[in-house]
Amino acid sequence: MGRITNKGSQFPSLFRTVPSNKLQALGLARLVIHFAWSWVGLLGEDSEHGEQGVEVVREQILKKSACVAFEDKLPRSPRPENTRRVVKTIAESQARVIVAFCGVEVLPVLEQLYEHGVEGRVWLSSDAMSQIYLLKNQKAFQMLSGSLAVVPHKRNVPGLRDFVLRLHPSSSPEDAFIQEFWSKVFNCWWNTSGGEETNNARYCTGEESLGNGTNAFLSMPGFDLAFNVHNAVYALTHALNNMVQKESRGPKIFGNKTQGFRPWKLLQYLRKVHFKNKAGEEVFFDEHGDLPGLLDIFNVHFQETVWVGRIEFGPSGIKKLEVNNTALLWAGGSPEVSKTIFFLMQSWEKFNPGK
């Protein structure tokens, strides 16, 4: 995990095409404020990443007069005693909203909460926790049903899926990378030399298909993040093109004459790059080397996640928050949140009598 704070200004040659972790923390805090949740538990990974994420959330919600019911940490390799402590804290707390800035290390906690019958909690999680949904753990899904997740906006690279589906070792026999890719995906050995099998690996038949429904490669985690790489490549290409056009009156920088090319020159053009990508989105870098932030909000509906909104960031912070309230399902599968809010209001009155 990267650091939470924006350190791009300390590293002027560092650029990011994915939203910083700080934006996710700000997004989680904004959801707490948006739904007027005023009695919240905070749970973070016991690391710099987790501590900074929780710190950002705490700072933001306290500004809006919300209260932190409890705050706890989970080691990346949680021990039974850590799990029991956190489960006890959650079970005994009156807070029904938990902001979690951690990953799969929270899974044992969810399982024990399920086994102890601790229900009715609304979890707000960052992208790190999304790996849990891939594990298809029934107990975890039961506990997280009705929760919200904030993740970096993902898009598909136009034409990439079709391009990958057309890949085949036999159509590009000179390309060793495709052969290796094929072998890795299908766990077989593409034999081009007529030699014998090695390591007892089975031969690839050539009949394997990336699109036959039995292969999960195209839905693997990270495949839908390819657009971030796409933006990075295009940003570099635009910067290089702008530099070539601008410097064309000076020394030649291509061919055998490269005396006019200096990396720091390209860096200057990369800082100023501004274009629209194939999704129609503006691409440019701020003073920290970050792109304009865009986060998707997902609601966990039993064993699936449903898109319910987005958070758009501008230079000065959150620019726009969209939430489709009619698509929301809360803990227990209800589209109504009134009981949860009522309980939270009772807790708020107990915490701040007379207000």
Question: Predicted regions: what is each one?
Answer:
Residues 1, 10, 18-38, 44-53, ...:
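Extracellular ectodomain signature
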